[in-house]
UniProtKB/Swiss-Prot annotation:
Name of the protein in question: Toxin CSTX-16
UniProt GO MF annotations: toxin activity
Glutamine amide carried by residues: Q19, Q38
GO cellular component: extracellular region
Organism of provenance: Cupiennius salei (American wandering spider)
Expressing tissues: Expressed by the venom gland.
UniProt record similarity statement: Belongs to the cationic peptide 04 (cupiennin) family. 10 (double chain) subfamily.
Taxonomic superkingdom: Eukaryota
Subcellular location: Secreted
Annotated keywords: Amidation, Secreted, Toxin
Length: 38
């Protein structure tokens, strides 16, 4: 499922960002990311 993959990618991406910058995962930004890829 492509959408599920996108969701997982989003999560992984933010996990990486969190480790880099030590910031909480912004859900809204995740949504924007998904919209851009659609």
């Amino acid at each position: 499922n492509f959408l599920e993959m996108l969701k997982e990618n989003c999560k992984l991406l933010w996990k990486r960002q969190k480790q880099k910058f030590r910031i909480p995962m912004p859900e809204s930004l995740c949504q924007i990311l998904k919209k851009k890829k659609q």
